[in-house]
């Protein structure tokens, strides 16, 4: 089984970098675990579809702005996310990217889980995360490791 952990975000937008930070820490902890790739991505849309191709399972890690409590860590499925109408394919959302990949015959993952960290601000240029989001990094790492253990049929976190 091939599993991808993909941290998403923009390192210049403060809280939006949380997915990248979590992925980097997960990578450090999983150096010797076969079958699990940990990567980071600053783009979305069709690029996201390409990155997921060929994996059996994918765990995405990203900041979310839903009006919840900053720093809250949640597990979501693609169906939990709203679809968006965009003017170009470059802005395609995750649910649409998965559908399009399957329609094109790409080997898309059978399961995608999103570990979402509620952000305070993803539109402000800053190099550091807000305190609540920075404090959520370790709980998000733990959530990713638990998700990987579940996907691999193991007890507890990897």
What is each PLM-predicted segment?
Residues 27, 53, 80, 95, ...:
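A generic membrane alpha-helix/interface feature
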Residues 2-6, 11-83:
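Nucleotide and nucleotide-moiety/phosphate-recognizing core
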Residues 63-112:
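Helix-loop-strand module that forms the ligand-binding subsite of alpha/beta enzymes
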Residues 97-158:
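Phosphate-binding/catalytic loops
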Residues 7-8, 68-71, 87, 117, ...:
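Residue-level signal for pocket-adjacent positions within structured domains
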Residues 20-24, 49, 95-98, 141, ...:
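Predominant activation on well-ordered alpha-helical scaffold segments within soluble catalytic domains
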Residues 17, 21, 43, 68, ...:
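Conserved active-site and cofactor/substrate-binding residues in soluble primary-metabolism enzymes
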